């Protein structure tokens, strides 16, 4: 089977990584050989004491990265992908994206680069007997609770950048177990149940009404097939229009 036939028969596999300074897309075939690639440069910004990327940065960046990949495929093989055998998203891990019940982002995305959660990280680490770095999502959530931030009362769910993109593409609030390990401690194939119970009590004692297993994204094993694309990424402008 030629590369063109593999592309047309969805025998290729797409990976997209949201790095700190570049969004990268790589297409491989069923022998793991690289087929095509694309990229989009971006930068975080420091706003109101927080390192962040806007939702427009995220959406536009993904569009342009994917358009760059599609253009590379077309220029090399004369075809345009209409689907893939599988795909995966990665995105710097950690960080904090908090949403209300209508999926509105409540505060600007807080990236892994922020070091504003030391009190929360220290208290959680002592409570659980497990090191919780400042960049983890649970540290950001608990710090927001400790700070008495206005948005906390409206939180329906939180996510990482990769988890957010996964939700946008599939409608599923799920992350792989590797991604989950930067949200909250994992044990086997899910969040550590003992730690969840302890953290839930701590949060409730501080006035947080949510339950972590309802607020955090679900956890999937590596290779699990639990979601499909509801669209072919986003409508993709030409990278020349960026």
Name every feature range the model reports, one short phrase each.
Residues 123-129:
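Active-site neighborhood of divalent metal-dependent phosphoester bond hydrolases
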Residues 110:
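Acidic, His- and aromatic-enriched active-site or binding-groove loops in soluble protein domains
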Residues 18-20, 129-236, 240:
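Gly/Ser/Thr-rich active-site cleft segment
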Residues 47-49, 120-123, 185, 229:
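Short, charged, surface-exposed secondary-structure boundary motifs
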Residues 117:
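Gly/Ser-rich phosphate-binding catalytic loop and adjacent alpha/beta segment
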Residues 67, 240-241:
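Solvent-exposed alpha-helix faces
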Residues 114:
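Carbohydrate-associated surface elements
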Residues 1-107, 122, 154, 210-217:
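N-terminal glycine/serine-rich phosphate-binding loop of ATP-dependent small-molecule kinases
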């Amino acid at each position: 089977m030629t590369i063109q036939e593999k592309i047309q028969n969805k025998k290729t596999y797409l990976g997209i990584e949201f790095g700190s300074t570049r969004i990268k897309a790589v297409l491989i075939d069923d022998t793991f050989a690289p087929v095509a690639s694309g990229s989009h440069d971006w930068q975080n910004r420091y706003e109101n004491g927080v390192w962040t990327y806007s939702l427009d940065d995220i959406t536009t960046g993904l569009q342009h990265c994917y358009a760059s990949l599609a253009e590379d495929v077309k220029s090399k093989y004369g075809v345009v992908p209409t689907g893939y055998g599988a795909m995966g998203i990665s995105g710097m891990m950690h960080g904090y994206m908090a949403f209300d019940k209508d999926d509105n982002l409540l505060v600007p995305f807080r990236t892994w680069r922020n070091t504003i959660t030391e009190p929360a990280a220290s208290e959680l680490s002592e409570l659980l007997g497990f090191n919780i770095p400042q960049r983890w999502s649970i540290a950001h959530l608990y710090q927001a609770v400790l700070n008495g931030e206005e948005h906390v009362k409206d939180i329906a769910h939180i996510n990482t950048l990769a988890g957010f993109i996964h939700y946008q593409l599939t409608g599923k609030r799920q992350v792989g177990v590797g991604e989950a390990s930067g949200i909250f401690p994992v044990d086997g194939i899910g969040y550590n149940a003992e730690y969840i119970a302890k953290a839930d009590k701590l949060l409730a004692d501080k006035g947080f009404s949510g339950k972590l297993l309802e607020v955090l994204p679900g956890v999937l094993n590596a290779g699990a097939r639990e979601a499909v694309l509801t669209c072919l990424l986003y409508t993709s402008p030409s990278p020349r229009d960026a």
